[in-house]
């Protein structure tokens, strides 16, 4: 009985051993787990170290990567967000600067929707604008008589933007800029007439940093003199553009510029056919310039033109008696100036914001149907940003520029609404284009398939008939 039982027991044991041996040969990855088959670690004891297989090595902790070759991290491209850089060293320090001679492919251009100064909050419109105010598309006829007029407000990034206009636009006949010359020749294709009125093309033809009041009364006459007499019968469109900047940053930048010796004393300030008298526009300093002026001294001058400069340069000054402060009371004057500046800014063909360089580029390109060669660069470090002021000084600057603060909030809201509206229209056109392409592809396939089916049927019929004849 015992012998028969041992025979029956021996067969399953041998079979089990055979299966275990075969399993070890067939499954090499099981080596580590099968070596201690049947041995379980006691409570509180760590089991034998297992060698991670290829499939589990990716999930292994870092200390188990010793035998795995460490590859260098992949190269990272330029970030889509803010790009800090030192302020460009030039006469007018500006936050944005074109990258000269650098031409990127289309897919490498920075996304204009990406945040430029850190994480931006979700945009919520504050002002109600009509569809006409938000839609900006200019049928700019560069081969005709149309002219772009750049209103350059001090310390708003105008020097950089002006260089973009003469050196960075893709044109049939680019502007000719020679080394050592401050002005470029921007002629229309096949003509010796200029299409751009700016510091770097025509110079300060209407005075140094001429404002809206001066330009609108001066530019038409200047352009008629420069133009050929035979073209005077044709109509001409003037498209005014400008740049705005955060009032506190702009004010500090102007203070630093004046501190280095800038005066702009040759500005004409023409209004109603004359310049202001010394009593109407006194100076803040007795000497040739205001070099070394402190911020407190700069703010204490009540007739400092830096105060509310953006509103004054965009408003129609003839509405308030020009620089004659006795023409009306101060409250009424401020109300009229602010409203006039808002209306003129809204009716301009284009305006950009220094703090949003890429969105400025995007809107300009869509407005005038012109493309820039190199993308705009956002500089976050300027001389103004390096100035450390306390909260009291900042509040004082905001109070001195209370009109500019209101204008900038209005301008920023209009700018953002125009940008989002333009992006939305562009997305709609792209979707419509894709739908049209898919529809054409379907029609093309539908036209091809019946012909192929018909040809196949004809071939079968012909073969059958020929076989019948043969039979």
From Swiss-Prot:
Active site positions: 209
Residues in compartment: Lumenal: 28-471
Listed EC numbers: 2.8.2.-
Keywords: Glycoprotein, Membrane, Signal-anchor, Transferase, Transmembrane, Transmembrane helix
InterPro entries given in the database record: Heparan_SO4-6-sulfoTrfase, P-loop_NTPase, Sulfotransferase
Molecular function terms from GO: heparan sulfate 6-sulfotransferase activity
Biased composition (Acidic residues): 88-114
Residue ranges annotated as Cytoplasmic topological domain: 1-4
Residues that hold 3'-phosphoadenylyl sulfate according to the record: 152-160, 245, 253, 377-379, 383-384
Residue ranges, compositional bias (Pro residues): 70-81
Protein name listed in UniProt: Heparan-sulfate 6-O-sulfotransferase 3
Taxonomic lineage: Eukaryota, Metazoa, Chordata, Craniata, Vertebrata
Primary gene name: HS6ST3
């Amino acid at each position: 009985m015992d012998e028969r039982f041992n025979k029956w027991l021996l067969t399953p044991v041998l079979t089990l051993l055979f299966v275990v041996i075969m399993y070890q040969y067939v499954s090499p990855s099981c080596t580590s787990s099968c070596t201690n088959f049947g041995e379980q670690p006691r409570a509180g004891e760590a089991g034998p170290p297992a060698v991670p297989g290829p499939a589990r090595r990716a999930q292994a902790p870092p200390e188990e990567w010793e035998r795995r070759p460490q590859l260098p991290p992949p190269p990272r491209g330029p970030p889509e967000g803010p790009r800090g850089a030192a302020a460009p060293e030039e006469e007018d320090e500006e936050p944005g600067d074109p990258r000269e001679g650098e031409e990127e492919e289309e897919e490498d251009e920075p996304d204009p929707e990406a945040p430029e100064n850190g994480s931006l909050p979700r945009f919520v419109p504050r002002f109600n604008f009509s569809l006409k105010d938000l839609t900006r598309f200019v049928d700019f006829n560069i081969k005709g008589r149309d002219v772009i007029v750049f209103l350059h407000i001090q310390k708003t990034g105008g020097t950089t933007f002006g260089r973009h206009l003469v050196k960075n636009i893709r044109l049939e006949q680019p502007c000719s800029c020679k080394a050592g010359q401050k002005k470029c020749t921007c002629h229309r294709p096949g003509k010796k007439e200029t299409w751009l009125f700016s510091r770097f093309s025509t110079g300060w033809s209407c005075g140094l940093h001429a404002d809206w009041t001066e330009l609108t009364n001066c530019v038409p006459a200047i352009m008629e003199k420069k133009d050929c007499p035979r073209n005077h019968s044709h109509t001409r469109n003037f498209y005014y553009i400008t740049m705005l900047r955060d009032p506190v940053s702009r004010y500090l930048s102007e203070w630093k510029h004046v501190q280095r010796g800038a005066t702009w004393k040759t500005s004409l300030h023409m209004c109603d056919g004359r310049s202001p008298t010394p009593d109407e526009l006194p100076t803040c300093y007795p000497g040739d310039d205001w070099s070394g002026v402190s911020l407190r001294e700069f703010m204490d001058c009540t007739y400092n033109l830096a105060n509310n400069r953006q509103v004054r340069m965009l408003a129609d000054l003839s509405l308030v008696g020009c620089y004659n402060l006795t023409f009306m009371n101060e409250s009424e004057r401020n109300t009229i100036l602010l409203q006039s500046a808002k209306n003129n800014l809204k009716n301009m063909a284009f305006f950009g914001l220094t703090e949003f360089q890429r969105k400025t580029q995007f809107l300009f390109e869509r407005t005038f149907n012109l493309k820039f060669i190199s993308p705009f660069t956002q500089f976050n470090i300027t001389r103004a940003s390096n100035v450390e002021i306390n909260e009291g000084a900042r509040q004082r600057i905001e109070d001195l520029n209370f009109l500019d603060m209101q204008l900038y909030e209005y301008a920023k809201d209009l700018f953002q609404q125009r940008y989002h509206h333009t992006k939305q229209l562009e997305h709609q056109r792209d979707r419509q284009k894709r739908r049209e392409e898919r529809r054409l592809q379907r029609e093309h396939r539908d036209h091809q398939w019946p012909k192929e089916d018909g040809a196949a049927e004809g071939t079968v019929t012909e073969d059958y008939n020929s076989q019948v004849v043969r039979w």
